[in-house]
């Protein structure tokens, strides 16, 4: 790469999961809409055909009249080919297939355990991690061997364990994880400012927050707008909308698999005094017992949904059809940013403007009362010198036990996956607050789910 007139040219980005029909398209749009970077994106995917399809789509986006930078998209046949010479590595993969995820999400329902997402914690999150961690061992080793100085951006869930595995295998890796859940809570605060004070068109980025926690279970203990403390306004709003909830935009929780009425957020704030900063579907899965997920009827009372794998399979077919339309020109390309910040973080690391954003990185003291090497979600400063976490301060005493339980479970999940330790795996599985079963029931469910994901497990699990 080289610099010319406040632009960086001849960059190489390796995209692992380059056949993605979601994250990849958004990333391509963001690159095309930014004039300060250009180069090559090497698409690597075990589904080679999907990568070939995205090569066509990516080059169409780059050639669009509204594109303000030029990127060349190519297909890499191997990880080595993709990674060699890379300045940045982006990872967004589906670990396994939706058939395995069907077991992750729905097998526990036979035991009265309902999951709204099933990709981070709970029984489903644990099993997804068992598949994902071996894949990330391979990816980390390849980055170590072929692009040790590249910056690595992860989008895959379970986010915490993906980033934790990368650092465990290659401690000198320069990796961080990006998640947009915090953005959604900042956006909620802009709407509350409109509703309560008539302040319209407040930008999400103007809501300044202190972020602390772990991915999908993050908290704000400070939130301001132009120096104004937003906590009193949020408390008033949460009390007024506790029963009804609050939604904005064109979707609502009854017709969207991802939407919610924010009742879980309001409830958590009134219980604990901090703003829970993720979607209700994610937050619910971290809480003890059956607080929000006792039954489908209880979930409806809290005004969010259980995202079924059947819905995901149908939505995949829609994305496959859209891929075809984009490739053939039946659907015109429209250049528009997707709201993510990955490309902006790249620019900051290249020296094209400092940026503070929430990311998932090793703790290293940012949250004083969580383990040093645990991966946490906090604000960090991005610039030419690298990534420096902002000291978030300790978690409040009433929230710490909720978060710490998952932190230690995640550490044990990593160890169990790396060592194929069935005993540690089972005890970690049973220690999740959503697994409200007796020992025999829990072991039966664990064995069933492990069997259902066996195609992606190291052979030592069957020893």
Residue ranges and their predicted role:
Residues 1-10, 38:
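A short, basic/flexible loop-to-alpha-helix module at the beginning of a structural domain
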Residues 11-44:
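N-terminal Rossmann-like dinucleotide-binding module
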Residues 33-67:
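Glycine-rich phosphate-binding loop and adjoining beta1-alpha1-beta2 segment
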Residues 72-85:
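Short acidic low-complexity segments
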Residues 84, 90-91, 154:
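Redox-cofactor binding/interface segments in oxidoreductases and associated redox assembly factors
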Residues 99-169:
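Rossmann-fold NAD(P)-binding glycine/threonine-rich loop
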Residues 151, 155-226:
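Rossmann-fold dinucleotide-binding core
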Residues 197-463:
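Long, compositionally biased stretches enriched for glycine and/or charged residues
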């Amino acid at each position: 790469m080289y610099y010319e007139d406040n632009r960086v040219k001849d960059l190489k980005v390796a995209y692992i999961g380059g056949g993605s029909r979601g994250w990849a398209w958004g990333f391509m749009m963001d690159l095309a809409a930014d004039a300060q970077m250009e180069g090559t994106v090497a698409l690597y995917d075990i589904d080679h055909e999907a990568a070939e399809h995205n090569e066509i789509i990516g080059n169409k986006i780059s050639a669009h009249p509204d594109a303000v930078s030029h990127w060349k998209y190519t297909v890499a046949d191997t990880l080595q080919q993709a990674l060699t010479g890379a300045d940045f590595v982006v990872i967004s993969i589906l670990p396994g297939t939706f058939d395995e995820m069907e077991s992750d999400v729905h097998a526990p329902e036979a035991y009265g355990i309902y999951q709204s997402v099933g990709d981070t914690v709970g029984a489903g999150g644990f099993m997804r991690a068992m598949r994902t961690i071996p894949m990330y061992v391979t990816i980390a080793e390849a980055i170590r061997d072929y692009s040790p100085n590249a910056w690595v951006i992860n989008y895959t869930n379970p986010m915490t364990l993906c980033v934790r595995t990368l650092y465990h295998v290659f401690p000198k890796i320069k990796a961080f994880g990006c998640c947009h859940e915090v953005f959604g809570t900042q956006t909620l605060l802009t709407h509350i400012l409109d509703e309560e004070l008539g302040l319209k068109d407040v930008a999400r980025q103007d809501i300044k927050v202190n972020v602390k926690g772990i991915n999908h279970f993050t908290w704000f203990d400070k939130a301001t707008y132009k120096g104004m403390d937003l906590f009193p306004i949020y408390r008033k709003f949460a009390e007024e909308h506790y029963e009804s909830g609050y939604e904005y935009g064109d979707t609502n929780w009854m017709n969207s698999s991802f939407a919610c009425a924010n009742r879980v957020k309001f409830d958590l704030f009134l219980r604990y005094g901090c703003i829970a900063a993720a979607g209700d579907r994610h937050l619910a899965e971290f809480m003890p017992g059956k607080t929000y997920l006792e039954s489908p009827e209880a979930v409806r009372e809290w005004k969010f949904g259980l995202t079924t794998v059947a819905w995901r399979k149908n939505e995949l077919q829609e994305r496959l059809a859209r891929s075809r339309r984009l490739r053939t020109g039946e659907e015109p390309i429209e250049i528009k940013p997707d709201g993510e910040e990955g490309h902006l973080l790249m620019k900051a690391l290249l020296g094209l403007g400092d940026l503070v954003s929430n990311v998932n990185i090793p703790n290293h003291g940012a949250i004083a009362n969580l383990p040093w090497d645990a991966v946490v979600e906090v604000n960090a400063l991005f610039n030419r010198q690298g990534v420096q976490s902002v000291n978030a301060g300790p978690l409040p005493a009433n929230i710490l036990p909720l978060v710490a339980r998952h932190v230690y479970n995640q550490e044990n999940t990593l160890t169990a996956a790396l060592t194929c330790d069935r005993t540690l795996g089972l005890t970690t599985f049973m220690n999740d607050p959503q697994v409200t079963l007796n020992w025999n029931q829990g072991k039966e469910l664990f064995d069933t789910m492990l069997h259902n994901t066996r195609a992606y497990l190291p052979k030592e699990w069957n020893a």
